[in-house]
From Swiss-Prot:
Modified residues (Phosphoserine): S2, S154, S472, S476, S478, S518, S561, S573, S640, S648, S665
Stored Pfam families: Tnp_22_dsRBD (PF17490), Transposase_22 (PF02994)
Keywords in alphabetical order: Acetylation, Coiled coil, Phosphoprotein
GO molecular function annotations of the record: single-stranded RNA binding
Modified residues (N-acetylserine): S2
UniProt feature, compositional bias: Basic and acidic residues: 498-508, 590-608
This protein's name: LINE-1 type transposase domain-containing protein 1
């Protein structure tokens, strides 16, 4: 216990020293930071003083500026109050005359109206850094626009046409405030309000007269400029230097632009600013917005909404044509009725409000998805046709012969079209004026031609070249459904159904036929004829397998075109009825032929090969089945092992649960032990404190052991100790006197059962006297009293005595071996070994040392505790 107390005391001392060192270091750091901060604070104070000086200078400059501004504003106010106010001119990019008119209105208003000035208050609040100076002048003109020339009535100079008693109000308000200005002398605020509202009934006459004179002067200037321009043009004409810049446009676009000419002139005269756009569109301004129109129909709709525009253009815009729509069979499309084969001379005119007369003809073509289906089905039927050559050879010969005749007809038409194109190129050499006259008076080169619509049986005849547009469409699906019916009724129904489907599914593709580009014209015609030839060649197979329309377009005479259309309907209806029944038979015959050929071609070698392959397949299948069975057996055998593993896992999980419970209990015990250890340490500390107190109280005491007791009790303890000192320590009396406080036997009561005499406890005045006696007793080794040997020791507590008693056996062995052992306070073993003193606090420490030292271990032998 004494060892633990010493270790605790040493730890406390170390901690105290560490705390002192830490506090000392912190104090030094604080002193250093104070030294570093001091110059920084000095610099900051200096910077602040410099900034304040600069700020004062700036404030003085600001005061000077404010004084100058105040003086200028005072001068301006005086000028305004004296009737010298000037109003800035208003800039207007559209009319230069508006500026002068506006200035005159304001001057007249200022002359006839009075001005009132109010100066209100002084000593207003003025801030340090804010300045708000406002100067407003507002002129509200309630008279409306003054730019139109027809604004005033020429017969009456006092009244206006739109408002008989229209008045003009001019309101000028000028406001000036000086606020938030730092002034040392005082605060001033000037607020000026200048308002002027007065009707202009008295001065209308003079004002209107002045406006009329100005407008007359402007008209004269405009006339002079026009005359100058005309004179310059005449001079240039005389000199032969007239230049005209015209866009290089085709004749069709020029003809279209002529339709807008009358409309253009009327709009230009009424200041609508019309323009021709590049896409042959008309644009003009209406209500401040630019309106664009691509055709007369859109313009007519807009005019119907605007009454003013409708009245202007009522003589120019054509009336709508009513279209009589019949039934489904005879209903002709609106665009096809209004198509125009337009050229430089506008041949074959048909009235149209749109721009469709730019195109030769609008042809309807199948969708791209349907064309792909046609191509795939054509490939399938081409294979069937090769097999069907023997059965239907005669029908194919007739069809090909008819197609060759039809191919020869467009070749002749191409020559006629080339001749017409050459004639049109010669006509293009004439000027624009001749073209306008020819379009209005002469007939075109295409007069006498016919536009034939075989689908709806409509013809447009002319005298020259005959053009026919034939749309032949067949639908095989509708024909296959009606195979059982009569041929005549079947033909009529199929043609009607195909015409209906074609009108729904086809797309419109316009072919431009501009007369100015003769090369393009030839190419377009050649492409059209070439397409007709290709489509006629593929007419029979496509009609057999698909229900999509396949169109043909050819140029021929009226009689030939009608015959061709009639023959084509017959051919297609005949082929549709014959091939549908023949295809199924051919398929069956082909399947039989292929089977027979396949069986005949198989030879013996091929049969052997097939047998070998079959055997190999069988063997491989059997092997795979065996392997699968083996794997299944292995799985079954391993199933028991899996079950055992599952059981073992269950056991392990149960054991784990038990272990967790035990660990929890052990943790609880450890917590309890930790609590017990805390209590034990507290008890040990308290005991150590008690022992220390007891040891200090016994520090001046000596025990005398072995002095016999007399029955008479004549000899007292004090006399006995004096005799012992005189007998054994006579030299100590010479140097100093040993003062004894008390001496008595312990315990105070006599125990008759006790065999040994009681100890005598002697207490000295000083602990130094006690130490002298103990040191002398160690040197003498033997102390006697009246010839008997006695023992003299220090007075110690029971705890220290118990701790020292543990060293008794070790002490004896070391004493016998000559190591000079001794027990130090409170219970330390010390002995000499190899010229050094070894000190041990506990027996465990001594045992560890002996085990590592073989010499000591040999000497001590079995006496090691």
């Amino acid at each position: 216990m004494s060892d633990v107390s010493t270790s605790v005391q040493s730890k406390f001392a170390r901690l105290a020293k560490k705390k002192e060192n830490i506090t000392y270091m912190k104090r030094e750091q604080l002193t250093e930071t104070d030294k570093d901060i001091a110059p920084v604070l000095d610099l900051k104070c200096k910077d602040v003083s410099a900034i304040m000086n600069k700020f004062k200078v700036l404030m003085e400059i600001q005061d000077l500026m404010f004084e100058e501004m105040r003086e200028t504003l005072k001068n301006d106010l005086k000028a305004v109050l004296g009737g010298k106010a000037t109003i800035p001119e208003v800039k207007n990019s559209e009319n230069s005359s508006s500026r002068t008119e506006f200035q005159q209105i304001i001057n007249l208003a200022l002359q006839k109206t009075g001005m009132v000035g109010k100066i209100e208050g002084e000593n207003s609040k003025i801030g340090d850094d804010n300045e708000n100076l406002t100067f407003k002048l507002e002129v509200n003109e309630l008279s409306g626009k003054l730019d139109n020339t027809n604004e005033y009535n020429s017969n009456d100079g006092k009244k206006l046409p739109q408002g008989e008693s229209r008045s003009y109000e001019v309101m000028g308000s000028m406001e000036e405030t000086l606020c938030n200005i730092d002034d040392r002398d005082g605060n001033r605020n000037v607020h000026l309000e200048f308002t002027e509202r007065e009707s202009r009934k008295d001065g209308e006459d003079e004002f209107v007269k002045e406006m009329r004179e100005e407008r007359k002067f402007q008209k004269l200037k405009n006339k002079e400029e026009v005359l100058k321009a005309s004179r310059e043009e005449k001079v240039l004409m005389d000199e032969g230097a007239v230049l005209t810049l015209v866009a290089d446009l085709s004749s069709a676009t020029l003809d279209i632009s002529k339709q807008w000419s009358n409309v253009f002139n009327i709009l230009r005269e009424n200041d609508f600013e019309p323009k021709f756009l590049c896409e042959v569109k008309l644009a003009f301004k209406c209500d401040g917005e630019i309106k664009t129109f691509s055709d007369l129909q859109s313009l007519r709709k807009f005019a119907s909404q605007k009454s003013s525009v409708k009245e202007l253009l009522k003589d120019v815009l054509p009336q709508k044509e009513e279209i009589n729509q019949g039934g489904r069979k005879y209903g002709i499309q609106e665009k096809r009725d209004k198509t125009l084969i337009d050229s430089k001379h506008r041949a074959g005119e048909i009235t149209s409000d749109g721009l469709s007369f730019l195109f030769l003809k609008e042809v309807k073509v199948a969708k791209p998805e349907e064309m792909k289906n046609l191509e795939t089905q054509e490939e399938e039927f081409s294979e069937l046709e090769e097999l069907d050559e023997e059965a239907s050879g005669m029908e194919d010969d007739e069809d090909t012969s008819g197609l060759e005749e039809e191919e020869e007809e467009p070749s002749g038409l191409e020559e006629e079209e080339e001749e017409e194109a050459s004639g049109l190129e010669e006509d293009e050499a004439s000027g624009l004026e001749e073209e306008e006259e020819q379009t209005s008076e002469q007939d075109s080169t295409f007069q006498g031609h016919t536009l034939v619509d075989a689908k709806h049986e409509v013809e447009i005849t002319s005298d020259g070249m005959e053009t026919t547009f034939i749309d032949s469409v067949e639908d095989s699906e509708s024909e296959e459904e009606e195979e059982g019916k009569s041929s005549e009724t079947g033909k009529v129904k199929t043609t009607s159904l195909t015409e209906k489907k074609a009108s729904r599914r086809q797309k419109e593709i316009p072919f431009s036929y501009l007369v100015g580009d003769s090369g393009k014209k030839k190419l377009v015609k050649h492409q059209v004829v070439h397409k007709t030839q290709e489509e006629e060649e593929t007419a029979v197979p496509t009609s057999q397998g698909t229900g999509t329309p396949c169109l043909t377009l050819c140029l021929a005479s009226p009689s030939k075109s009608l015959e061709m259309s009639h023959d084509e309907h017959k051919k297609h209806s005949h082929t549709n009825l014959s091939i549908s029944t023949g295809v199924t038979k051919l398929k069956k015959t082909e399947e039989k032929k292929h089977r027979t050929l396949h069986t005949e071609e198989l030879t013996s070698k091929e049969a052997d090969l097939t047998e070998e392959t079959e055997e190999n397949l069988r063997s491989s299948v059997i092997n795979s089945i065996r392997e699968i069975k083996e794997e299944i057996g292995n799985l079954k055998s391993s199933h028991s092992g899996v079950l055992e593993i599952e059981n073992s896992v269950d056991d392990l999980s149960s054991r784990m649960d038990i272990l967790e419970e035990r660990i929890d209990s052990l943790e609880d015990q450890i917590e309890e032990f930790s609590k017990d250890t805390m209590q034990m340490t507290k008890q040990i500390i308290s005991k150590e404190r008690q022992r220390d107190i007891e040891e200090r109280s016994r520090s001046c005491n000596i025990r005398l052991i072995g002095i016999p007791e007399k029955e008479s009790y004549e000899n007292r303890a004090e006399d006995i100790i004096k005799e012992i000192i005189d007998e054994n320590f006579a030299e100590l009396k010479k140097g100093s006197s040993l003062e004894i406080v008390s001496a008595c036997r312990v315990p105070s009561k006599i125990d008759e059962k006790r065999l040994t005499p009681r100890h005598i406890l002697v207490k000295f005045w000083n602990s130094s006297d006690k130490e002298k006696i103990i040191r002398a007793s160690r040197e003498r080794r033997e102390i006697t009293y009246q010839g008997t040997r006695i023992r003299l020791t220090a007075d110690l507590s029971l705890d220290t005595l118990d701790a020292r008693s543990k060293w008794s056996n070790v002490f004896k062995v070391l004493l016998e071996k000559g190591f000079n052992p001794r027990i130090l306070y409170p219970a330390k073993m010390a002995f000499d070994f190899r010229g050094k003193t070894k000190v041990f606090l506990s027996i465990e420490e001594f045992r560890d040392y002996v085990l590592h030292m073989p010499t000591l271990r040999e000497l001590l032998g079995n006496n090691i505790p």
